Amino acid sequence: MAFSQYISLAPELLLATAIFCLVFWVLRGTRTQVPKGLKSPPGPWGLPFIGHMLTLGKNPHLSLTKLSQQYGDVLQIRIGSTPVVVLSGLNTIKQALVKQGDDFKGRPDLYSFTLITNGKSMTFNPDSGPVWAARRRLAQDALKSFSIASDPTSVSSCYLEEHVSKEANHLISKFQKLMAEVGHFEPVNQVVESVANVIGAMCFGKNFPRKSEEMLNLVKSSKDFVENVTSGNAVDFFPVLRYLPNPALKRFKNFNDNFVLFLQKTVQEHYQDFNKNSIQDITGALFKHSENYKDNGGLIPQEKIVNIVNDIFGAGFETVTTAIFWSILLLVTEPKVQRKIHEELDTVIGRDRQPRLSDRPQLPYLEAFILEIYRYTSFVPFTIPHSTTRDTSLNGFHIPKECCIFINQWQVNHDEKQWKDPFVFRPERFLTNDNTAIDKTLSEKVMLFGLGKRRCIGEIPAKWEVFLFLAILLHQLEFTVPPGVKVDLTPSYGLTMKPRTCEHVQAWPRFSK
């Protein structure tokens, strides 16, 4: 080749060399020193600049489950230039989140997290120190006190039972009204409103604006939240996307801003008639803790209350709403299952009273149905991302400090090593051999609320709420769809995954009151 030809190719050669050097620098920058005796987690080769973003696709839980079958329970991918370790397998996840919980209790400093309550959310904030732990305990105690604790002024066994019973009966009335008017309905918005009223009553008591249009519009737009707080959201790993037109991100910002303003206003109104000698809701309990904050070193200054209430509201809302919606759709597609639940309710409850929380141990088939909803749908496919708080190791692999960790709950719930026919909806799998109780060992293998030090603070109240809502609804109603209507159970990926809306659900009274 003539020298002149080399000269003509110089710009292309320089560009290729520059690209190669940049790629090499990026890849080298993501590598860490691995201590002797340990290995780096395995994983596939990624593309320059974008890493494995395209590999994740529209359903990252499925893509990463497939990769785990090839690379094992601890694998590593890159999203952009950020290394992400993906954990699968129940035993591996328990080892990380429970036995090595202090190592894996962090949160990554993701951009989308900074938009939630102005970056001060207890659930999404990277802080995992002693102040965070103490505030988390206080939030858990407040939630417990005004949900499963006894209400001395009510005939109900606890606050939660009182609020759910009231809202479940309202929901039945709304369904029957829609049946009389149209003959079918779309259940999501009705369920959203009822569940929001329950958690709102527990948070604010009589101060919660039950029929506020502002509140209803906010909770009905919660999809703008769950679509953005997802494992693998591109905006968290590619900063340039924050400055480009992004309608979904704009809706997410607006939702968070508006919801915080709504909570600030409601909390402030609540404070006007706060009486420390008569605590009747979660916010009141938090006010009491905040009163002596400066005097005795308490852990909740008043300005933090909105942030904590926001976390509690979220913990008691999205999971319950999604579980009930999935339940209704699977009831209409599995009529034999619905019939068995009806038979159990008729035998145990009869027709002279409503189900109560105390009936739960005597309704094992309904409980098995709910567990199978959690497992089969796995509608929380990943936990909120974790991060490591220090250099650590897992299964012989080195994981550096501040490494982003994805926990694949969907894989755990569909692991063929743990479950027979995992892709079949079969509530009976959770019953003991004599069908009289729940197989506790098997039920503890279901993952939906996370594990360890970041386990969802609303797990117990949420499970009780789902049970009582469904028990009351199914005691009174039979759910169907008209002949020929097909229900699409294909979920849309997000923090919580919901199936497509079905506008042709029907609810028929089972007996006259």
UniProtKB/Swiss-Prot annotation:
EC number per UniProt: 1.14.14.1, 4.2.1.152
Cofactor field: heme
UniProt keyword annotations, A-Z: Endoplasmic reticulum, Fatty acid metabolism, Glycoprotein, Heme, Iron, Lipid metabolism, Lyase, Membrane, Metal-binding, Microsome, Monooxygenase, Oxidoreductase, Steroid metabolism, Sterol metabolism
Pathway named in the protein's UniProt entry: Cofactor metabolism; retinol metabolism; Steroid metabolism; cholesterol metabolism; Lipid metabolism; arachidonate metabolism
Keyword Acetylation: no
GO annotation (BP), single: nitroglycerin metabolic process
Residue sites binding heme per the record: 456
Subcellular location: Endoplasmic reticulum membrane; Microsome membrane
One Pfam match: p450
Swiss-Prot/TrEMBL catalytic activity: an organic molecule + reduced [NADPH--hemoprotein reductase] + O2 = an alcohol + oxidized [NADPH--hemoprotein reductase] + H2O + H(+); 17beta-estradiol + reduced [NADPH--hemoprotein reductase] + O2 = 2-hydroxy-17beta-estradiol + oxidized [NADPH--hemoprotein reductase] + H2O + H(+); 17beta-estradiol + reduced [NADPH--hemoprotein reductase] + O2 = 4-hydroxy-17beta-estradiol + oxidized [NADPH--hemoprotein reductase] + H2O + H(+); estrone + reduced [NADPH--hemoprotein reductase] + O2 = 2-hydroxyestrone + oxidized [NADPH--hemoprotein reductase] + H2O + H(+)
Any one GO MF annotation of this record: demethylase activity
CDD domains in UniProt: CYP1A
Keyword Oxidoreductase part of the UniProt annotation: yes
Residues of this chain annotated as glycosylated in UniProt: 68
Annotated Gene Ontology cellular component terms: endoplasmic reticulum membrane; intracellular membrane-bounded organelle
Induction of its expression: By 3-methylcholanthrene (3MC).
Origin: domain of life: Eukaryota
Major place of residence: endoplasmic reticulum
Protein's membrane topology: Peripheral membrane protein
Annotated family: Belongs to the cytochrome P450 family.
Subunit structure: Interacts with PGRMC1; the interaction requires PGRMC1 homodimerization.
UniProt function note: A cytochrome P450 monooxygenase involved in the metabolism of various endogenous substrates, including fatty acids, steroid hormones and vitamins. Mechanistically, uses molecular oxygen inserting one oxygen atom into a substrate, and reducing the second into a water molecule, with two electrons provided by NADPH via cytochrome P450 reductase (NADPH--hemoprotein reductase). Catalyzes the hydroxylation of carbon-hydrogen bonds. Exhibits high catalytic activity for the formation of hydroxyestrogens from estrone (E1) and 17beta-estradiol (E2), namely 2-hydroxy E1 and E2.
Identification of the protein by name: Cytochrome P450 1A2
Annotated source species: Rattus norvegicus
Taxon lineage: Eukaryota, Metazoa, Chordata, Craniata, Vertebrata
